[in-house]
Amino acid sequence: MKKHTMNYLNKLYSYLLLSLISILFVNAHPATIKQDIDWPQFMSQQDMIWEKLPEYWYDSAFLGNGKLGLMIYKEPGKNYLRLETGNCDVHDHRTKRDVFGIPRLLTGHFALHPKGKIINGTMHLDLWNAEVSTDITTTKGVIHLRSFVHADEMMIIVKATTEGDEHDFQWEWIAAEANSPRYLIFKRQGKANKIPKDYELNPTAKISNEKEVNLSVQKLLAGGETSIGWQETHNPETERTLWINLTHTYPQNNSSEICKAEIRKAIRKGYHPMQKTHRKWWNTFYPSSFITLPEAQKENFYWIQMYKLASATRGDRALIDNTGPWLTETPWPNVWWNLNVQLTYWALNTSDHLDLAASLENALYNHIDQLRLNIPKAYRHNSLGIGVASNLECMTTEVGIPGKGKAQVGLLPWACHNLWLIYRHKMDDDILRNKLFPLLKESINYYLHFLKEGDDGKLHLPATYSPEYDTVEDCNFDLALLRWGCQTLLESAHRLNIQDSLIETWKNVLLKLTPYPTDENGLLIGKDMPYAFSHRHYSHLLAIYPLYLINKEQPNDIEMIEKSLSFWQSKPTALLGYSCTGASSISSAIGKGDDALAYLNKLFGKFLSSTTMYKESGPVIETPLSAAQSIHDMLLQSWGGKIRIFPAIPATWKDIAYSGLRTEGAFKVSASRKQGKTQFIHIKSLAGEPCIITTDIVNPIFEGKRNFTIQSLPNNTFQIDLKKGEEVFISPQGEKSDFIISSIPHTSKNHYGLKIIHQRR
C-alpha cells in the first residue's frame, strides 16, 4: 500500500511539474521587437548648448577620437578664442617611473585673434555628429566655426566662415611648456620645494614653415619628439579651413614627416569627404544600445558620458587616464590604478561598447613584461603587479612588499576584475584561456608569497595599504580581491578544463582565508582598524561592490551591506563625487532604487560642471563616467549568473525603456516599463550561456520561434533554455505588448553647456 502511495505521489508530482512547465511554454508565434527612435532628433535633445562663451576647462566644449583631443573656450582676460590641443601619446620617457619622469605632456593651443573686440558668443556640441559649432560676435563682425576631431584620421579640422570685416582674423600657435603638469602646478603655486631638485626642463619648441605646412617641434631630453603641424586652406572669400595634426614618436625622431604626410593626405581627400566618414563613424556608434530615462537631465547626462567615452578611447588607441585626451595642468598627469581606471571602464560593458573597452585589454595584455618589472625582483619569476600611477605602457614605481611600509598590492587584481567583466560580457574563451587566466594567475601569485597561517588555523595577510586610508593586516580591500581571484581562477580552470598545479592552493585559500574583519558598524578597514575618519574611497567595501562577494542573495549579508554603507556615509567630511556613485551602486545591489537615486542626486547637486566634467584638486574624468554605470545598475544587473531586469528602480521613475544593453553571459536585453509596470522584455543569447532572469512580471509568458522549457525558481526567477542566437520575448500574461522601444517625451532638453542664468562651475 505504501509503495502504491509513493508511486501515486511521484506521478502527481511529475504531473504538476509538467503542468507548470507547460503553462510556461512559449507561444510558438515569434514576436518582433522594433525601435521607434528618430536618432538624430533624439540625440539633438542631448546636445550641449552654451549661451555664452566658456572661459575654463571645466566648462569648455570637448572633442576627441581616442588619441587626439580638442577643447574650445575663450581665454580668460584676453580677446581670443582658445583651441587647446592634446595627444594621448605625448609623454616623457625619463628613467624615473613617477609623475615627473613619465607623465603626459601638454602640447599647446591655437589662439583665434579676431579683428574686433569679442562682444559675446555661443557654442553648440552636436553629439550625433561629434561636431562643435561656435559663433563669435565682435565689434567688426561674426566668426562661425565648425570643428571636429576626425573619428578615424589623426586630424583636427576647423572650418571658419565670417561676416563683416572678420575674414582676416588671425590664427596663432602657442606651444605649451613640455614639462610635467605637476611641475607646472607647483611652479605656478610657488611650491618649488615639492619639485625634485634634479628635475631638468625639456627644451622649448621650435616653430618653422615647410612648404605650406607649419610645424612646432618639441624635442625631449630623454629622447623622442612631438610635432604639431597645421595648414590653412581657403575656399570662397569668406571660408577658411585649418587642418591640424599632432604626432609623437619615440625613440625615433620622425614625427615631422608623419605629421606633414597626414595633413597633406587629409587635404587631398577634402573637407566634405572627411566630414562624411567622420559622421558615419559616430552615427554608427550610438545605436549599439539605447536608454531613455524619465528625468531629462539624467538622460542628457547619460548620453554625454557615452559621447565622452567614445571621444576618450578606441580599442586600438589610448588607455583612458585621468584626463583622457583633454590634458591640462593637473596633479594627476598619468593613469591611476587605485580606483580611476576601474571606474572609468565599467559603463562600456552594459552599454555594449566593448570595442572601446579593448583599450584597457590591450594596455594590460600587451605589457606583461612591464607588469613583471613592476614587481620586486625576488618575485618576478611568477608574479605581476602595477603601482598606483603608470604611463600608458603600464610602467610604474615598484609595488610594495606586504609587511613593509605602504604596500599597495591589490591594484592589478582589481584591474583584472575589469578584464573579467569584459570577458563575461563577451564570453570569448580564447581570451580567457590565453590572456586573462595567465594574467590573473600571476597577479594573485603575488599575494600567495605572503599568506601565513595563524594560531587560529586561518590564512592571514601581512600589513598592506587600503587605498587612501592606512596600512593594516588582513586589509579588507586585499582579502576581497584575493578571495575573488581564487574563486575566478577555479571557475576558469573548470570551464577551460585546465589542470593547473595551483588548483589545490586556490581551494585551500578559499577554505582557510580569514573572514572579513567586521564590527557592529559593518566592514572594517582591516584587522582591528575601524572606519574611523571620513574616506572618499570605498576600498574596504569592495567585497560588496563591484565584486558582489557579499550580496543580497545571501540573506545574512543584507544587514552587513546596509550597516557598512550607512556607516561609511555617516562621516561626510571627505566624501566626494565617486563616494556618491559608489553608494548609489551599492544601494542598487540590494534593490534600493530610491536610495540609489538619492545618492546619485548628490553628485549632480555638487560635483559636476556645466559640461558634466568633474573637479577635485584638479581635473579628472572617471566619476561622471562611473555615474553612467550607477544608472545601469538601477536598470539592469547580471552578477552571479542571473539577469535582473529593473532591479532597483526609484518610485518616481515610472517610465523607462532600454534596448540592446549587454549582460554577463553575453545576452542582449531590451525592456520597457510604463506607469511603474514592466511591459515587456526581450533577450537574445549571443553565446548560449545559461539564461536565468528575475523580473517583476508576476505571470510572464515567453514567446519565440520554438517552445522553450521554462523552469520556475524562487523570487520570480526563471531559467530559460535559450540557445546561442535565439531570442525570447517576455510579457505579462493576458496583456498585449507591442515590443516597441521608443523614447520618453520630455518638456525640457539640452540641460548641459554654459547657461547665462544658471551658470555652474
Label the model's feature ranges.
Residues 151-160, 665-692:
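Carbohydrate-binding surface patches
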Residues 337-373, 392-397, 404-426, 434, ...:
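Active-site core of glycosidic bond-cleaving carbohydrate-active enzymes
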